[in-house]
């Protein structure tokens, strides 16, 4: 039986490479890692190389600990390898270079604009809303089982649930003790550490927006909240630091939604000699072996969504 698929990958003359660094990596560190990343991607078959720091293209989010590279290849007549062969070659060079994170080289999707890379894009959904920690646990279990399948070369989850963060809780009892309106305190906390829209104004033939927020140096650390004050019922100024509780936590950097549920995306690459259809069948088997379908659901995105839709709507006919 010949393995089936949706559309075959083609040599489009360019590749994508993505570098995901460890949680809480600063932009400055990412710039240093990007130099090593760019050096490892140099090859006689590469015509131009452009890197962007601070963008995770697989999840379409801006994050300081990620880099993306657009690799333009030389004309087919000037290089002996196909784009698929070059992707494997560059992936090996990245592995040898040593890096503080995860890197991958990807071919673009067969249909431009439908997703960001080839392979299979699967989504696991938290149907009961049990929270990010529960979803991450299910994703890890699914990923471990899927990685053992012979059809699958690589199964990556983009849900980083161990991002070090600071949880700031506005204490109601402290607000009551200091005679501070909790809504006012919450507004100041959000406006100074985030931003708040004020209004529009017209000038120089254009319409402008007005926002307020604290200066960058005053938002660099939570200790700076000693300089933010709230006026209480007696007219006295109370520092925000006296109204909040702060603790260290680990949580996800972002949460994606799919079909109204919290979800996690998996990027899955077929092993050579296997089609995306075989990979999708393998993933479905793994799902039913490891997941409770009443608590966790699954779906596809990008090219995989189209492939699954075609498989479910068009039957095989023989004349």
PLM ranges: what are they?
Residues 14-21, 66-72, 104, 119-126, ...:
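Active-site-flanking beta-strand signature of metal-NTP-handling nucleotidyl enzymes
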Residues 22, 54-55, 72-74, 127, ...:
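Residue-level recognition of strand-loop junctions within catalytic nucleotide-signaling folds
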Residues 28-116, 128, 132-144, 173-195, ...:
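Solvent-exposed, membrane-proximal periplasmic/extracellular interface segments of envelope transport
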């Amino acid at each position: 039986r010949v393995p089936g698929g949706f559309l075959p990958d083609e040599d489009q003359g360019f590749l994508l490479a993505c570098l995901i660094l460890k949680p809480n990596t600063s932009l400055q560190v990412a710039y240093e890692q990007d130099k090593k990343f760019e050096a490892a991607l140099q090859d006689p078959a590469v015509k131009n190389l452009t890197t962007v720091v601070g963008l995770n293209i697989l999840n379409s989010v801006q994050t300081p600990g990620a880099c993306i590279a657009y690799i333009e290849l030389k004309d087919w007549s000037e290089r002996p390898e196909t784009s698929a062969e070059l992707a494997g070659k560059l992936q090996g060079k990245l592995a040898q270079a040593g890096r503080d994170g995860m890197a991958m080289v990807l071919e673009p999707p067969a249909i431009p604009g439908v997703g960001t890379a080839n392979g299979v894009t699967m989504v696991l959904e938290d149907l009961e809303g049990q929270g990010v920690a529960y979803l991450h646990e299910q994703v890890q279990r699914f990923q471990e089982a899927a990685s053992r399948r012979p059809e699958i070369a690589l199964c990556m989850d983009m849900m980083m649930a161990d991002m070090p963060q600071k949880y700031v809780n506005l204490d109601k009892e402290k607000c009551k003790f200091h005679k501070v309106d909790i809504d006012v305190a919450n507004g100041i906390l959000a406006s100074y550490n985030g931003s708040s829209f004020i209004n529009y104004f017209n000038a120089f033939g254009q319409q402008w927006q007005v926002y307020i927020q604290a200066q960058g140096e005053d938002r660099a650390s939570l200790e700076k909240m000693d300089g933010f004050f709230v006026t209480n019922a007696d007219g006295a100024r109370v520092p925000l630091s006296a109204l909040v509780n702060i603790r260290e936590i680990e949580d996800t950097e972002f949460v994606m939604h799919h079909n109204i549920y919290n979800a996690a995306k998996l990027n899955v690459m077929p092993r050579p000699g296997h089609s995306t259809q075989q990979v999708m069948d393998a993933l479905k088997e793994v799902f039913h072996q490891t997941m409770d379908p009443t608590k966790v659901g699954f779906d596809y995105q990008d090219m995989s969504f189209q492939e699954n839709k075609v498989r479910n709507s068009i039957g095989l006919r023989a004349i």
